[in-house]
Design a protein with these regions (language model features):
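Pepsin/retropepsin-fold aspartyl endopeptidases
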Residues: 1-124
Length: 124
Protein backbone atom coordinates (compact mmCIF):
# COMPACT_ATOMS: atom_id res chain seq x y z
CA UNK A 1 0.00 0.00 0.00
CA UNK A 2 1.19 3.49 -0.83
CA UNK A 3 1.85 5.99 1.95
CA UNK A 4 1.18 9.70 1.42
CA UNK A 5 3.61 12.20 2.93
CA UNK A 6 1.77 15.41 3.82
CA UNK A 7 3.06 18.10 6.15
CA UNK A 8 5.75 15.76 7.45
CA UNK A 9 3.19 13.10 8.43
CA UNK A 10 2.65 9.64 6.93
CA UNK A 11 -0.96 9.03 5.84
CA UNK A 12 -2.62 5.77 4.78
CA UNK A 13 -6.12 4.57 3.96
CA UNK A 14 -7.70 2.21 6.49
CA UNK A 15 -10.74 -0.03 6.11
CA UNK A 16 -12.70 -0.69 9.31
CA UNK A 17 -15.30 -3.46 9.50
CA UNK A 18 -17.77 -3.61 12.38
CA UNK A 19 -20.99 -5.65 12.41
CA UNK A 20 -20.86 -6.22 8.63
CA UNK A 21 -20.49 -2.48 7.89
CA UNK A 22 -17.34 -1.12 6.22
CA UNK A 23 -15.89 2.35 6.60
CA UNK A 24 -12.97 3.62 4.49
CA UNK A 25 -10.91 6.35 6.16
CA UNK A 26 -8.33 8.22 4.07
CA UNK A 27 -6.87 10.64 6.65
CA UNK A 28 -5.21 8.07 8.94
CA UNK A 29 -1.67 8.66 10.23
CA UNK A 30 0.95 5.94 10.64
CA UNK A 31 2.24 6.69 14.13
CA UNK A 32 5.10 4.49 15.29
CA UNK A 33 5.29 6.64 18.43
CA UNK A 34 1.78 5.64 19.50
CA UNK A 35 1.38 2.42 21.47
CA UNK A 36 -2.28 2.04 20.50
CA UNK A 37 -4.46 2.53 17.44
CA UNK A 38 -6.98 5.34 17.84
CA UNK A 39 -9.91 6.51 15.72
CA UNK A 40 -12.12 9.60 15.74
CA UNK A 41 -15.48 9.08 17.45
CA UNK A 42 -17.06 11.33 14.82
CA UNK A 43 -15.92 8.97 12.06
CA UNK A 44 -16.57 5.57 13.66
CA UNK A 45 -20.04 6.57 14.87
CA UNK A 46 -20.98 6.01 11.19
CA UNK A 47 -20.46 2.29 11.93
CA UNK A 48 -22.52 2.44 15.11
CA UNK A 49 -19.38 2.47 17.26
CA UNK A 50 -20.53 4.67 20.12
CA UNK A 51 -19.74 4.56 23.84
CA UNK A 52 -21.78 2.12 25.90
CA UNK A 53 -21.90 1.84 29.71
CA UNK A 54 -19.76 -1.34 29.76
CA UNK A 55 -16.96 0.10 27.59
CA UNK A 56 -13.65 0.68 29.36
CA UNK A 57 -12.74 4.39 29.50
CA UNK A 58 -9.22 5.62 30.07
CA UNK A 59 -7.02 8.64 29.58
CA UNK A 60 -4.33 8.52 26.90
CA UNK A 61 -1.41 10.91 26.71
CA UNK A 62 0.70 11.99 23.78
CA UNK A 63 2.77 14.86 22.50
CA UNK A 64 -0.42 16.83 21.80
CA UNK A 65 -1.79 16.42 25.33
CA UNK A 66 -4.25 13.95 26.79
CA UNK A 67 -7.82 12.86 26.15
CA UNK A 68 -10.34 10.32 27.36
CA UNK A 69 -11.03 7.37 25.06
CA UNK A 70 -13.21 4.28 25.12
CA UNK A 71 -12.26 0.85 23.81
CA UNK A 72 -13.98 -1.32 21.19
CA UNK A 73 -13.04 -4.31 19.05
CA UNK A 74 -13.32 -4.07 15.28
CA UNK A 75 -14.28 -7.18 13.35
CA UNK A 76 -11.42 -6.32 11.00
CA UNK A 77 -8.93 -3.51 10.44
CA UNK A 78 -6.98 -3.42 7.17
CA UNK A 79 -4.36 -1.30 5.48
CA UNK A 80 -4.36 -2.79 2.00
CA UNK A 81 -3.09 -6.38 2.35
CA UNK A 82 -2.26 -5.93 6.06
CA UNK A 83 -5.31 -7.03 8.04
CA UNK A 84 -6.13 -8.11 11.58
CA UNK A 85 -9.42 -9.52 12.83
CA UNK A 86 -11.06 -8.91 16.21
CA UNK A 87 -8.72 -5.98 16.74
CA UNK A 88 -9.03 -3.67 19.78
CA UNK A 89 -8.98 0.09 19.14
CA UNK A 90 -9.31 3.26 21.18
CA UNK A 91 -11.91 5.86 20.20
CA UNK A 92 -11.74 9.52 21.15
CA UNK A 93 -12.42 13.10 20.03
CA UNK A 94 -9.07 13.52 18.23
CA UNK A 95 -9.43 17.31 18.12
CA UNK A 96 -5.82 18.12 17.20
CA UNK A 97 -6.38 21.19 15.05
CA UNK A 98 -5.92 19.49 11.67
CA UNK A 99 -7.90 16.88 9.70
CA UNK A 100 -7.24 13.42 11.11
CA UNK A 101 -9.53 10.40 11.24
CA UNK A 102 -7.24 8.03 13.10
CA UNK A 103 -3.79 6.86 14.12
CA UNK A 104 -2.37 3.43 13.34
CA UNK A 105 -0.20 2.62 16.35
CA UNK A 106 2.51 0.09 17.11
CA UNK A 107 -0.08 -2.43 18.35
CA UNK A 108 -1.40 -2.91 14.81
CA UNK A 109 1.95 -2.48 13.05
CA UNK A 110 3.72 -5.11 15.15
CA UNK A 111 0.89 -7.67 15.20
CA UNK A 112 0.48 -7.37 11.43
CA UNK A 113 4.25 -7.65 10.86
CA UNK A 114 4.22 -4.38 8.93
CA UNK A 115 7.29 -3.23 7.04
CA UNK A 116 7.44 0.50 6.32
CA UNK A 117 9.63 1.46 3.36
CA UNK A 118 10.22 5.20 3.65
CA UNK A 119 12.29 5.41 0.47
CA UNK A 120 9.39 4.07 -1.63
CA UNK A 121 6.67 5.40 0.71
CA UNK A 122 5.06 1.96 0.99
CA UNK A 123 3.82 -0.28 3.77
CA UNK A 124 3.43 -4.02 3.38
Amino acid sequence: MKIRLEGGLLYVTADLIYKSLTLKLTEVILDTGSAATLFSVEEVSKLGLVPEPADPIRRVRGVGGSEFVFSKRLDKLSLGDLALEDFPVQIGAMDYGFPIQGLIGLDFLMQAGAVINLEKLEIH
